[in-house]
Amino acid sequence: MAENRRIQKVNSLIREAIANVILKDVKHPKISNRWITVTRVCLSKDLHTARVYVSIMPHENTSAETLKALKASAGFIAYRASKGVFLKYFPEISFYLEDIFSPQDHIENLLWKIREQDKN
């Protein structure tokens, strides 16, 4: 139980550090011009690897390009984030897209279609 609490705290610290690096230090045009939210971090039990889940706005066609740029910049992001988190080993990070907007978009599209049908 104490180990789970420790991993949760480290997840939170790493999430904040990575979010700050993406916001302040990354100058890549496909990253800096997007609204990127680090939604969660999942560390392995040995704390050597971390899956970083992000949501990207605008979401339409740019999220794949932005995710590719994040993956290419993962080493730089991990290096800069490691300066703000004091761990013996900073985990190797990999980025994954968390698609939290699709259900909302789907509902909004359905409502839009209903409104259009009511007008006709």
From Swiss-Prot:
Pfam families: RBFA. Its main location: cytoplasm. It is found in: Cytoplasm. Keywords: Cytoplasm, Ribosome biogenesis. It comes from the Bacteria. One of its GO terms (cellular component) is cytosol. NCBIfam families: rbfA. The keyword Cell inner membrane does not apply. It comes from Chlamydia felis (strain Fe/C-56) (Chlamydophila felis). GO terms for molecular function: ribosomal small subunit binding. This is Ribosome-binding factor A. Signal peptide: none annotated. One of several proteins that assist in the late maturation steps of the functional core of the 30S ribosomal subunit. Associates with free 30S ribosomal subunits (but not with 30S subunits that are part of 70S ribosomes or polysomes). Required for efficient processing of 16S rRNA. May interact with the 5'-terminal helix region of 16S rRNA.
